[in-house]
Each structure stands twice: as C-alpha cells, then as structure tokens.
C-alpha cells in the first residue's frame, strides 16, 4: 500500500544489494534462476559470433581482392539476402526443411552436435551477411591506400600485403560493427531459444513474461543489459589498442 516512489526506492535499494526478488514460479531467488540460464545463451552466442566474424573476414577479404569479380558479385547478393532475412522466418523454414521434410536434424531441445546446428546457423546468418559487406568495403579501401601501393612497389609478397597491411588496417571499422552484431545476436537468442526450446536466458524471459514472473523478467533484462554494456566497453578498449590514433587522443 506504499506510494509508488517508496516502492521504487525500496526496489532500487534491494537491487543495489543484489536482491532481485524471488521467482513466483520456482520459489527461489530470481538472480539464481537467471544465472543458471546465462551459460547456455553465452555459449550459443559466442560460437555464433565467432563463426560469423571469421566467415566474414574470409569471404569479405576474398571479395575485396578482386572487386566486381564473379566471387564478389555472388557474395554481395548472398550477403545482402542473408542480412535481410528475419530470424523467425529462417528458423521456421529451416525446421520445415531439415527436421520435418528431410529428418536430418532434431526439431528442438539441447544435446549433442546435431542440436547446435540449426540454432547457431540461424544466429549466424544475419551478422555474417552484414559483416561481409563491412569487411569487403574496408578491405577495398585498405588495399587501394598509399601504404599498400608502396608495399607492392617495394616487392613485398602479395600474401604479406593482404594480411599484414591490408587486413590489419581494414578490420578496424569491423570491430565497432562486430560489437553491435554481438548485441544483435544476444537479442536474436530470445527468438532462437524460444523456437528451438533452448533453456537459455531468452526462453526464460519469454516464459517468465507469459507466466507473469516479473522478478525473473526484471533480473533477465538487467543482466542482459549489463552483458551488452560490457561487450561495448570491451570493443572500445580493443579499438583503442589496435588503433594508435585513438590512444594518442
């Protein structure tokens, strides 16, 4: 019966002490319920982000080596299509094709390697498509710069030109975009975990909303925000380490 501002002040005070309240559904501290689900989401997101980043560097660099070539044109069409594909539509389509029709992969649940293929594949598609475009543009700019032309004029091997000079400088803009895509993967995990029945923080959040378990919902949102904020801080530090101009400023 206390006024709203008193209830809010009490909530903030409890929050500062790490008390998110108790889960109505599980009759346990909400923070414990959320912390149990975080490793599943982090493992899924980490694998997806690693594949997207490494794949984008490889495909984008190959496309930038010969701009407007056959590989470049194909990669642009495929990457633009991938970047535009909604996660929920791709997930449902993948289930219909690979689980229902072909019976190659399990429909839902968590287990061995086959259970990881579709969830990770869905999370990889959009970030991979966007990062390929960014890597391609950055590498084209880097490979046409004066220091690369000078290195080639001095007879430096092409492999060294691409990886030592081009790739190192061309990846700087990719770092910022990769941070945004890491946050996007965390958001996409909510959809993917719900569709494929993965017991991560995304599915936990949706289940808690449907069951009106508001303590778990609040804890899930705050923990997710902290993780995304931490990712952005790490990206800023990495950018400063790799780019001396930022450190000097």
Question: Model regions: which residues?
Answer:
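Hydrophobic alpha-helical transmembrane segments of membrane transport/permease proteins
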Residues: 1-9, 102-118
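Alpha-helical transmembrane segments of integral membrane proteins
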Residues: 34-71, 100, 110-249
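Membrane-water interface segments at the C-terminal ends of transmembrane alpha-helices
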Residues: 10-13, 77-107, 122-126, 133
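An internal, D/E-rich "acidic patch" concept
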Residues: 1-57
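Active-site-proximal inter-transmembrane loops
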Residues: 72, 76
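A short secondary-structure junction motif
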Residues: 15-19, 101, 185
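Alpha-helical transmembrane segments and their lipid-water interface positions
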Residues: 17, 90-91, 140
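Short, hydrophobic secondary-structure boundary micro-motifs
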Residues: 5-9, 21-24, 90-91, 106-108, ...
